[in-house]
């Protein structure tokens, strides 16, 4: 028995909100988002319905919608979403040793004027399950 036999085939797909907007247009995407319901966390629902499109357009964050699809791929059900955002972290050069500074040079931007490194740190800004079904 190989590993693929042990792992069930998944029928979940993720679609980037920006890609969906390009393909379907804002009105149709808003219609899809309107089907989302999260009664246990109103902020999660409000973000998706009122801010996610604008945040995607302005590149503040990237939202991905998760759909379950039938085996024949004819039907899709909106089951949830997640949003990735970036926080910029500033680190004073004097607060770290040479080895750490060398690592930061690979991943961040050094500002000679302020003697600081700035790095982008991704985080899950929103995570929501659709309870409408």
Predicted regions, residues:
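Non-catalytic substrate-recognition and accessory regions of acyl/acetyltransferase enzymes
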Residues: 1-132
């Amino acid at each position: 028995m190989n590993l693929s036999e042990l792992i069930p085939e998944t029928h979940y797909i993720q679609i980037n909100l920006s890609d969906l907007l390009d393909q379907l247009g804002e009105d149709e995407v808003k219609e899809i988002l309107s089907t989302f319901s999260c009664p246990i966390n109103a902020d999660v629902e409000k973000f998706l319905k009122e801010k996610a499109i604008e945040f995607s357009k302005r590149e503040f964050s990237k939202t991905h919608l998760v759909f379950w699809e039938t085996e024949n791929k004819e039907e899709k059900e909106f089951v949830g979403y997640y949003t990735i955002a970036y926080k910029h972290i500033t680190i004073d050069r004097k607060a770290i040793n040479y080895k750490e500074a060398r690592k930061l040079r690979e991943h961040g931007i050094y500002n000679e004027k302020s003697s600081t490194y700035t790095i982008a740190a991704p985080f899950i800004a929103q995570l929501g399950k659709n309870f409408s079904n």
